[in-house]
Amino acid sequence: MEAYGKILLIAMPAFLLLVLFEKWYGWRKGFDTVRNMDMISSLSSGITNVTKDVVGLYLIVLSYPFFLRHLALVEVKATWLVYLIAFVALDFAGYWIHRLQHVFNFFWNGHIIHHSSEEYNLACALRQSISGIVKTFAVFLLPAAIFGVPANVIAIVAPLHLFAQFWYHTRHIGRMGFLELFLVTPSHHRVHHAINPEYIDKNFSQILIIWDRLFGTFQEEQKNIPPVYGITRPVATWNPIRINFQHVWLLIKDAWHAHSWWDKLRIWFMPTGWRPADVAAQYPVYKIVDVYHFEKYDEGGNSFFATWIWIQMTTLLLLVSYLFANIGLIKSLDSSYIILYGIFVFIYVYAYTELMDRNKYAPIWEALKAAMAIGIIIYTGDWFGASGFVSGIQYVLIGWFLLSFAITVWLSKKEQGPTELSAAH
């Protein structure tokens, strides 16, 4: 937990700088692929994902060390070859997990957030799920466990393998020659994120494209078929927390409304997007039919509104950085404070992304955020030990949360109506 938090203190600013560089580069080249609100939504999703992992808001079932203890045929040392084997094993497992997430209704809920952006850029790589409360990833690492790959090797290689998937989420890099034969490139992954009929459910590989070539899911990017990004049932929100549970909520409602008990049971394991015929007829859900002519979810708003949202997210990044840098200190004050801090981060994200959506309940969420934060400060006399670093910081934070609430109420009244839509293509 603490080690991962320290890694993120380096990774987060690095990713943010690369995202901003892509925005600047696209602007300079006259090919801007990054919209402000979409980028903030993506970054906010990344914040919720890493916060969940750092504070431990999940349950691991059948962990890798369990399989290693019971299935390892040999005991091996952590040599460079073992690290290489671990990397390949993780990549192989990643391919099949990724494929399952696309194929079955229930598993799609854990991946929908990653495809929810209607753009394709570095920021959308940070759209990672928070809906997976129970982790069963280790089941797919059985080959590594059988061959005795040490658990600490997996622990080191896993985040590196994840971070290595960031760079190819861009439209600014074309074909890459011979590398296209064995590595996942931006061209390959653009196909994967596309909703064109020719591209959908292709290129599941994460680092080595060889898995798609071996298992029949490979598709080249075609010059005459420009990829169109997003999902066929658009999420129509900037709120990453709502996106994370939008699909499973639809499944729950469909299962409830279905007349057939067989449909109520099988809906969870049917192909992604399947709905009982009677439910689909009675409760239709919008789905994109022509991918070249649909309306993108757009931010609208003026420059002050956009600036305010940026200020909100930047302030949250500072608060999250404090959490990651001081996990040990916060736990020493009270072990429950880590979970409390994590819940606060989620409410913070929910509040300002509801404002981004022009949701009329945004001030209520902002009030809840302010009440929770000020309540923590009044009850403990501090902000999780922060006054030991900056004297009086708790009073500054009280002022900030009150100001934030006031401006949110003002903007909610000023920005009338739902977010406007603009033509996509």
Where are these predicted regions, by residue range?
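Substrate-recognition/cap regions that form aromatic- and gly/pro-loop-enriched pockets
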Residues: Y297-P418
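Loop-to-helix transition at the N-terminal end of transmembrane alpha-helices
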Residues: I10, T33-V50, L333-I343
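Structural signal for membrane-spanning alpha-helices in multi-pass inner-membrane proteins
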Residues: G26, N49, V61-P65, H98, ...
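Hydrophobic transmembrane alpha-helical segments in integral membrane proteins
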Residues: M1-F15
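Transmembrane alpha-helical segments that form the membrane-embedded catalytic/substrate-channel core
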Residues: F15-W24, V88-V103, H161-G174, T185-V191, ...
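Cytosolic/stromal cytosol-facing helical appendages immediately following the last transmembrane segment
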Residues: E119-C124, W167-I309, Y361, L397-H425
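Membrane-interface helix-loop junction between the first two transmembrane segments
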Residues: L20-I40
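Membrane-embedded catalytic scaffold of the fatty acid hydroxylase/desaturase
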Residues: S44-L59, A78-I241
